[in-house]
From Swiss-Prot:
GO molecular function: metalloendopeptidase activity; RNA endonuclease activity; zinc ion binding
Cellular component aspect of the GO annotation: cytoplasm
UniProt-listed Enzyme Commission number(s): 3.1.-.-
The protein's name: Endoribonuclease YbeY
Native source organism of the sequence: Porphyromonas gingivalis (strain ATCC 33277 / DSM 20709 / CIP 103683 / JCM 12257 / NCTC 11834 / 2561)
A GO BP annotation: rRNA processing
Metal-binding among keywords: yes
Binding site for Zn(2+): 108, 112, 118
Names of required cofactors: Zn(2+)
InterPro entries: MetalPrtase_cat_dom_sf_prd, YbeY
Function according to Swiss-Prot or TrEMBL: Single strand-specific metallo-endoribonuclease involved in late-stage 70S ribosome quality control and in maturation of the 3' terminus of the 16S rRNA.
A Pfam family per the record: YbeY
Annotated Gene3D superfamilies: Metalloproteases ('zincins'), catalytic domain (3.40.390.30)
Length: 151
């Protein structure tokens, strides 16, 4: 049974429209022949994600998302840590709305759980294309002026 959880550590939990985000994630997973199992998002600050990156991945840098894959066969399961600090700073640097960048990061982790990679230039280009396709799906679902966040 599909279950998507949202938690926060050191930040306020974004006001996610849970039903819509759940439907969107399920649609994206379905495109890759996957079903949603249990997915947990932990929204955090830069310091929290840096410590997790150091402890679990032996990386000494900040990042917007860390994805821990617990997938089984064709069922998507995993834990995703998202630094809202980095999402916010990336949105400013890219001249994007915060909400749009958050949507991209939310689905980026799901795409990793569906098997996409982003370590090589070719893989990164495929990931970006998949993110864009997923964001179009989102816009078709909720309308171009709406957001996954409650305002």
């Amino acid at each position: 049974m599909a279950k998507i959880n949202f938690y926060a550590e050191g930040v306020s939990l974004p006001r996610i429209r849970r039903r819509i985000v759940g439907k969107w994630i399920a649609e994206v997973c379905s495109r890759y022949g996957k079903a949603v199992g249990e997915i947990s998002y932990l929204f955090c600050d830069d310091e929290y994600i840096l410590k997790a990156n150091q402890e679990f991945l032996d990386h000494d840098y900040y990042t917007d998302i860390i994805t821990f894959d617990s997938c089984e066969a064709d069922t998507v399961n995993g834990d995703l840590l998202i630094s809202l600090d980095t999402v916010r700073s990336n949105a400013r640097a890219l001249d994007l709305r915060y909400e749009d960048e958050l949507h991209r990061v939310i689905i980026h982790g799901i795409l990793h759980l569906c098997g996409l990679k982003d370590k090589s230039k070719k893989d990164e280009a495929q990931m970006r294309a998949a993110e864009e396709e997923a964001l179009v799906m989102l816009q078709e679902t909720i309308g171009s002026e709406l957001s996954l966040l409650h305002t």
